[in-house]
Design a protein with these regions (language model features):
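Single conserved hydrophobic/aromatic residue that forms the stacking wall/gate
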Residues: 188-198
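N-terminal auxiliary segments of SAM/dcSAM-dependent transferases
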Residues: 2-37
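A short SAM/SAH-binding and catalytic strip from SAM-dependent methyltransferases
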Residues: 158-173
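Conserved SAM-binding loop of SAM-dependent methyltransferases across substrates and taxa
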Residues: 90-104
């Protein structure tokens, strides 16, 4: 039996309804805005991957450097766990962590999450081929949908990884709420040593 590829966390009617509400709310404000999730359809995700390779875009290089230096230590500290990556995109940087987990040989589950089904599906297929001993299943949905789903699932040990510059897409209060929701996801595990890598 082939492994599951994606779990879709929204039904299309509700997603369209919420999308319309988001657009109306954002464009009705004095300071017009749209939620960043609209940037990341298949084409937007592809463009962002290209932006990450530009010399001017330093966050990707900085995070890669940090992971190159500390991935083995992170894998040792977190051990056998469920690693959830919020906004995973192509999971390029995270492969450094996956390689480190592979070295220690513990049982391991990786759950990449994204709002772009195209890039998530491509990434999950590639990762399932490269890491056949890992359980890898993508979650398709927004951060809020992903975190709400994770709150309903109890697991032995969970590490949540939030890489990239997406924190800048939140208003301060929204980011506080986001971190609170991440904390709630970590409380729904049976291991007191859960981690959040931001």
């Amino acid at each position: 039996m082939s492994p599951k590829l994606l779990k879709i966390l929204n039904d299309s009617y509700q997603a369209v309804k919420n999308d319309g509400e988001d657009v109306i709310k954002g464009l009705s404000r004095n300071l017009k805005s749209l939620p960043p999730k609209y940037f990341y359809d298949d084409r937007g995700s592809e463009l962002f991957e290209q932006i990450c390779e530009l010399p001017e875009y330093y966050p990707t290089r900085t995070e890669t450097s940090i992971l190159e230096q500390y991935a083995d230590e992170i894998a040792q500290i977190t051990g056998s766990c469920e690693l959830v990556e919020l906004g995973s995109g192509s999971s390029t940087k995270t492969r450094l962590l996956l390689d480190a987990y592979q070295k220690i040989g513990n049982s391991f589950t990786y759950i990449p999450t994204d709002v772009s089904g195209g890039i998530l599906k491509t990434s999950v297929l590639d990762l399932q081929e490269k890491y056949p001993d890992f359980t890898i299943e993508g979650l398709l949905g927004t951060y809020q949908q992903t975190l709400a789903y994770l709150e309903s699932i109890t697991t032995q040990s969970r590490t949540i990884c939030f890489l990239g510059s997406s924190a800048g897409n939140f208003a301060p209060q929204e980011f506080d709420n986001f971190l609170t929701q991440i904390t709630s996801c970590l409380l729904y595990t049976s291991d007191a040593a859960d981690e959040c890598l931001c």
